């Protein structure tokens, strides 16, 4: 398989970046563009790997790729993953409504529960889902099937409605404050309590 840019890497997330107080949520338009792109690529068997960042910061993996920082559109994704183009290997990472990086390295899952027939792209999708709360979309270059990986589990050969539902669930998922935000709140509350004692 010529697509071999993904290698096994440890997750080195920064403590203060692991949970962010402000999460960049993606819009309904971004969902439409993602679904359109994935199934357009599937029809012509263009392989793709798209990681939707959620609360856990994926900066460690973003830095392994090439900066894109562009509004996500279906045509942009199709252009990135077009075969024999400089950006088609590796993963795209999406933050909010923007493609932040392409050709990113991801950790490969070594889970014994996965089929031995699973390819590198699918193992990378599961791998990043094991170390983060991201949702990863995979388009198979062999079959054109669209699959997703989330929390270490993979769903194979889903249809457009199911992908849209998964993206909506991620978009609307209840988010609790991250660690850094909780620390800031406790520090602020402590300062306010101290002020009240001295009034």
Give the positions of each predicted feature.
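Divalent-cation
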Residues: 1-199
């Amino acid at each position: 398989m010529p697509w071999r840019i993904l290698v096994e890497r440890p997750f080195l997330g920064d403590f203060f970046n692991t949970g962010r107080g402000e999460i960049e949520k993606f819009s309904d338009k971004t969902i439409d563009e993602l679904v359109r792109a994935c199934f357009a690529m599937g029809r012509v068997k263009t392989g793709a790997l798209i990681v939707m960042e959620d609360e856990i910061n994926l900066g460690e993996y973003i830095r392994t790729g090439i900066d894109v920082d562009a509004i996500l559109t279906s045509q942009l994704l199709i252009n990135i993953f077009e075969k024999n183009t400089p950006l088609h290997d590796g993963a795209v990472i999406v933050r909010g409504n923007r493609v932040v990086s392409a050709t990113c390295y991801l950790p490969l899952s070594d889970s014994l529960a996965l089929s031995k027939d699973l390819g590198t792209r699918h193992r990378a999708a599961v791998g990043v889902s094991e170390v983060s709360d991201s949702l990863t979309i995979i388009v198979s270059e062999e079959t054109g099937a669209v699959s997703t990986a989330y929390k270490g589990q993979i769903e194979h050969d889903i249809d457009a409605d199911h992908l849209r539902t998964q993206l909506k669930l991620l978009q609307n998922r209840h988010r609790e404050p991250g660690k850094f935000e909780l620390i800031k709140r406790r520090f602020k509350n402590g300062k306010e309590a101290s002020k009240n004692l001295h009034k």
